[in-house]
């Protein structure tokens, strides 16, 4: 069968190649035909060997993190949980515990703000989607960016989201755009976006307001980002950027009396982009967390469990099936993986590989 593998760490992308079939699965596994594999930023970092999850990988290497597949015997479609299989292949054997069925019979998710949210998405029958009504390409393209904020808000934040003000730092990124919609769906009263460019912020659906972080360059002295007074009290910060802007947000955010500011670092674009930015903790004044009621957490596999992810998947998939994608999704056959990986025309979209 065919697969897409990274041959060397100096290679810019995976190459289309042939590998042996996986063979019959043991009883604890299912063999799936892979339908779609998303290529988010983390997969590109893994392909270059610079993501922590790729540090001990051996070559040739499949950098995928998750995917959508179908059991050809039953017709049931499954989401393959992160880091549980090499998905850039035509077929894959996966432990049953690492599969979430995209079919009727899953527990119905309960929205935090009633049976229907402000965007008209009703969840009363959310899990009653038959596999054939779900678009595997859309699920594969959306699940990573949407799950980042969904899991952060559902498992890494104390208390309800309903009525809170959520600030999304990095709101113009794909995950940031999704985070705005997720926060809205889960009941946030106000969502504020922060990013470098006003033009990009104007195109983010669901914001109540935005703040531009400007062109703060590493090494500048006497320059510090601060939130304007009109933002008002902030309850939750979802940070996809990190760096000095994140430190500025924590230092300047107004905190409602008797409440705590909950900061969750989901990504760290400032470091990943190689701009020379320091980590937020290097720029955060040491006295700040003793003088302001701030709770600092991270979000990702490890900070929440695989069991948490399995529990949240029915609600997450129901939301994915109904949401309007906040960015373009560009699919390509796996035989074109090398060209689409480096194609400038796909940079504004989420690439999904179809084996």
Swiss-Prot record:
EC number(s) reported in the record: 1.1.1.-
Keyword Oxidoreductase in annotation: yes
Family, similarity comment: Belongs to the zinc-containing alcohol dehydrogenase family.
Class of the enzyme per the UniProt entry, highest EC level: oxidoreductase
Record has Oxidoreductase as a keyword: yes
Induction comment from the UniProt entry of this chain: Expressed during both sexual and asexual development. Expression is positively regulated by the secondary metabolism regulator laeA.
UniProt keyword annotations, A-Z: NADP, Oxidoreductase
Gene: tdiC
Taxonomic superkingdom: Eukaryota
Cofactor requirement: NADPH
Biological role: Probable NADPH-dependent quinone reductase; part of the gene cluster that mediates the biosynthesis of terrequinone A, an antitumor agent. The first step in the biosynthetic pathway for terrequinone A is formation of indole pyruvic acid (IPA) from L-tryptophan by the aminotransferase tdiD. The nonribosomal peptide synthase tdiA then immediately converts unstable IPA to didemethylasterriquinone D (DDAQ D), via condensation of 2 IPA molecules. The symmetric connectivity of the 2 IPA molecules is thought to arise by head-to-tail dual Claisen condensations facilitated by the TE domain.
Single GO MF annotation: oxidoreductase activity
PANTHER family: SHORT-CHAIN DEHYDROGENASE/REDUCTASE, ZINC-CONTAINING ALCOHOL DEHYDROGENASE
Organism: Emericella nidulans (strain FGSC A4 / ATCC 38163 / CBS 112.46 / NRRL 194 / M139)
Pathway membership, UniProt: Secondary metabolite biosynthesis
Protein name: Probable NADPH-dependent quinone reductase tdiC
InterPro entries associated with the record: GroES-like_sf (IPR011032), NAD(P)-bd_dom_sf (IPR036291), Zn-ADH-like_protein (IPR051397)
One GO term (biological process): terrequinone A biosynthetic process
